Amino acid sequence: MYTSRLLFAPVATALLAAAPALAQQQDFSKVQMTTVKVTEGVYMLTGAGGNIGVSAGEDGVFLIDDQYAPLTDKIKAAVAAISKKPIRFLLNTHWHGDHTGGNENLGKAGVLIVAHENVRKRMTTEQFIQAFGQKTPPSPKDALPVVTFTDAVTLHLNGDEIQAFHVAPAHTDGDAVVHFRKANVVHAGDLFFNGIYPFIDVDSGGSVDGMIAAADRILGVTDDRTQIIPGHGPLSHRAGLQSFRTMLAVARDKIQPLVDQGKTVEQVVAAAPTKELDEQWGKGFLTPDQFVRIVYSSMKKRPAGGGGGSR
């Protein structure tokens, strides 16, 4: 445990603001929701926390993620400016509080919450993320998903076939990708941090290998016209996700030999293995050193005999 605390201590400072238990300490009064029209009937909302996806049409409103509880009224106002129809469904792409913080408010309002079964499992039990040094207590009943799935679930709404499918553990063990088949839009959740190094929740089963494999799954359902809503960062496309995937693979392949040599995390960080990537990717909420620590940790937690995934 002492080694783990040392490993993640530098990460905690950058990420504490996103820890669910500390969300109440943030000043959300100044947060403004911004609406981006992705295509007819599909929108992206940005504010604080993960990007929100919106499907609006004759059948009502379907939300993907809901940021933090204090922002629920602002989210509702942004949705009302798009559609006068009620919010009927909410899907959580994973369990983290910057994507599920509004669940309780929406659940109490009668919104049906959907997620992968591991999201509900984690939300019903205490969680501890080393990077935050933060315990998250079980969520209240109204915040929990009431419909769960294992592999995939499809919603036939607003003239589209909207499929949410699970990927093998990547950012967490409960990640879901939402594919609007007709609109040709994908909400990738935190499987895609556009333009910045991603946080990978190793304590929730995440890994750099899983992130790369998840990017490949998403690329497999997209084409050059697909628009991709990332978990964090601006609206993107297939080329943007491919660039993110390439970065992850390069970082892994630079760090892997150092891990194989038995280097300590401090020695790996000192070697600056991501220096060729840092100018483009290292200016987000994770510094290059923090990202290297996370990748190192995910490699050290691989099962015996496990190696790198696809190239």
Pin down the residues of each PLM region.
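Accessory terminal helices/loops
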Residues: 19-25, 220-224, 235-311
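Metallo-beta-lactamase
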Residues: 37, 60-61, 68-70, 120-167, 172-173, 181-182, ...
